[in-house]
Amino acid sequence: GDLSHHLETFPPVYQPTIKGERQQINSGTPWESLAGYSRALKIGNRILLSGTTATHGDLVVGRNDPVAQTHFVIDKIEASLESLGAKLSDVVRTRVFVRDAKGWEGALLAHGERFAEIKPANTTFFANLIGNEYLVEIEAEAQI
């Protein structure tokens, strides 16, 4: 899902912060500092990725389109993984949060397209996501 035509600029590759055994990356969203969390955290061979939405700077990518949002979210997850020396194929679990019944099928079809060969464990939830424009949020775990 290349949505680059929606964006004027791309963020630079995330640079990990190393604190002992922990490597963390932050994407620069205001929520990370406000709520005190990392976009992704690597400890040993395990990588945990926080809930990720279709946010680019102050722009919501794929507004009103759960398929586009899902592809963009997975692109962000993939960039986070690559920043920590992993790849999308290292994902072993995802959790997909969808706003409502109208968007679940499109979100899961996009998830299925991107993870067709990987087939991680997955749980899907209906959730009252923060911000009405967000239709999909995804958490992921990887093992390298």
List PLM regions with ranges.
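N-terminal presequence-like segments and the immediate start of the first folded domain
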Residues: G1-D75, A79-V92, V98-I144
